[in-house]
């Protein structure tokens, strides 16, 4: 594949997009943090307008839709890491690129974008087609988010545990080489915790918050009060004994306050015990161990001592402690296990993309639009 010229790379700063199910992060190569942090949602007004003044338009995108959620019916284009609503996805990309990043011509910039590991090839094909044809990007690279998170950590070896809004994955990488046969994924993430909390609140507190706008309220509640218990059985015993520090109060937008008790740790427990919601996955700790056990025997020790957390869901209180507790139990104390939890792990995927696209050695990896036009099938297989 032809390299982009040095002048091309110099005068056309690459754009980096971490295309998350919950929040889309976007910005320019070489910068320390993303310039755009927008909720990945689109909202349409659900009421008839009766006055000329007030809000203009009937479609709102990203953070604007989040702010006006009470007036809107919200749509989430990405479900479990897969784009299901391409029209809404295009609206979000257009808004982020043109309005937030204020790009005059996206076609003059190479674009790195993330895609969940083990996604259907059809999703990547559609993504490439939309970005090349609709947005006219000049060059494209589609990356595994876990690989970028490892770049951001400054390491070349580690098992990346990436948990976002739509899915969780475990990706072992050794000395810069991804080990695809050992990658694992489960389609449970932060959105499922939010949904579980919705059901539990109705059952335990009689609070019904099920509209698309109310779902965002519950998402905020999850982020503020939920946590992972290190030992779920002991936590249940403490709760039954009436321990008051396990109860948290959350204020709803209408001023009502509700007490959240054992739902605080029961809702996120689905990550580690998916059978709670009737799914057959083994749980995140088991999945991490299975990924590492799939690699060659000689590679396991350095992977166990470099387990890197990435994604917004890993910022739940107690997440790292729970992973360590479970993995030490699974290895029966025979291996040294180290959990690495970067303080900015919500953004480490984007930061890794910013670093990667700035390397001179990366320039040969871009897929140019001319290559895609010549042989799109071959190019799809290169967008990894």
Swiss-Prot record:
Coiled coil: none annotated. The gene is ARP1. Core component of the dynactin complex which assists cytoplasmic dynein by increasing its processivity and by regulation of its cargo binding. The dynactin complex is required for the spindle translocation late in anaphase and is involved in a cell wall synthesis checkpoint. ARP1 forms the backbone filament of the dynactin rod structure and serves as the scaffold for the remaining subunits. Required for proper orientation of the mitotic spindle. It is found in: Cytoplasm, Cytoskeleton; Membrane. Pfam families: Actin. The keyword Cytoplasm applies. Changing residue 378 to A: Temperature-sensitive. Reduces nuclear migration in mitosis. Strongly reduces interaction with JNM1. Self-associates to form an actin-like filament of 8-10 monomers. Component of the dynactin complex composed of at least ARP1, JNM1, NIP100 and ARP10. Dynactin comprises a short rod of the ARP1 filament attached to ARP10 at its pointed-end and probably associated with the capping protein at its barbed-end. The rod is implicated in dynein cargo binding. A sidearm formed by NIP100 projects from the ARP1 filament and is implicated in motor binding. Changing residue 162 to A: Reduces spindle formation. Reduces nuclear migration in mitosis. Changing residue 75 to A: Reduces spindle formation. This is Centractin.
């Amino acid at each position: 594949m032809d390299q982009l010229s040095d002048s091309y790379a110099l005068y056309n700063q690459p754009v980096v997009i971490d295309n998350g199910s919950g929040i889309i992060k976007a910005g320019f190569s070489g910068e320390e943090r993303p310039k755009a942090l927008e909720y990945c949602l689109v909202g349409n007004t659900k009421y008839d307008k009766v006055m000329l003044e007030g809000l203009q338009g009937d479609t709102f995108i990203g953070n604007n839709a989040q702010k006006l959620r009470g007036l809107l019916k919200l749509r989430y284009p990405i479900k479990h890491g897969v784009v299901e609503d391409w029209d809404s996805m295009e609206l979000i990309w257009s808004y982020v690129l043109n309005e937030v990043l204020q790009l005059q011509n996206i076609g003059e910039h190479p674009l790195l974008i993330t895609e969940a590991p083990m996604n259907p090839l059809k999703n990547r094909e559609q993504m490439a087609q939309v970005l090349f044809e609709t947005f006219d990007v000049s060059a494209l690279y589609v990356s595994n988010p876990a690989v970028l998170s490892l770049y951001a950590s400054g390491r070349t070896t580690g098992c990346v545990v990436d948990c976002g809004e739509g899915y969780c994955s475990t990706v072992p990488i050794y000395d810069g080489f991804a080990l695809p046969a050992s990658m694992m994924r489960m389609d449970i993430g932060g959105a499922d915790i939010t949904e579980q909390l919705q059901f539990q609140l109705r059952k335990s507190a009689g609070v019904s918050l099920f509209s698309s706008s109310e779902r965002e309220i519950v998402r905020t509640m999850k982020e503020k009060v939920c946590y992972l218990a290190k030992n779920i059985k002991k936590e249940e015993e403490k709760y039954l004994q009436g321990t008051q520090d396990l109860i948290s109060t959350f204020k709803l937008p209408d001023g009502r306050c509700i007490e959240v008790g054992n739902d605080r740790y029961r809702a996120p427990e689905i990550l580690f015990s998916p059978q709670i919601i009737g799914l057959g996955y083994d749980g995140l700790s088991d999945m991490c161990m299975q990924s590492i056990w799939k690699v060659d025997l000689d590679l396991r020790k350095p992977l166990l001592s470099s387990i890197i957390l990435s994604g917004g869901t890993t910022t739940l209180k107690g997440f790292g402690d729970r992973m360590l507790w479970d993995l030490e139990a699974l290895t029966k104390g025979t291996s040294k296990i180290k959990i690495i939890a970067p303080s900015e792990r919500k953004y480490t995927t984007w930061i890794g993309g910013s670093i990667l696209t700035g390397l001179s050695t990366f320039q040969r990896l871009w897929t140019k639009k001319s290559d895609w036009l010549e042989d799109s099938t071959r190019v799809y297989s290169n967008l990894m």
